[in-house]
């Protein structure tokens, strides 16, 4: 989906929310929820388009063609602060003797292998978990993906290991 189509969907969602509000002006909370939902959907889709375009740029890059072969293109879902971002992510194989594999896009944007959360989403989850509970923290993101308490606990433990490694005794 291109950016213009995303903007058209956003404007349609906003205008629909406005129309419903004018039919029932006492229901301001519905307007607020509709606007939030429309803008989050737009933001997540926009991020997906941007990441897919960056992936295409990496795939077509001359320097990449000299050192890597394309193995396959996978659909990736990244849980972010604005919702689930779906994008194409190409799996590459090095042409050198070692022949290691990697997702260049993930390396470029600093995602660890098999990471499910963006940095901002992880901060939101961990902050909420510290304030309330693991269960409540799993509800803070507008994601359709299941986020278990165990996933959150593991993420928190990983973050604590990183912090401890950064500040040795």
PLM regions with names:
Residues 1-95:
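Short, conserved DNA-binding cores of transcription-related domains
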Residues 2-4, 8-19, 85-169:
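Short, positively charged, Gly/Tyr-enriched micro-motifs
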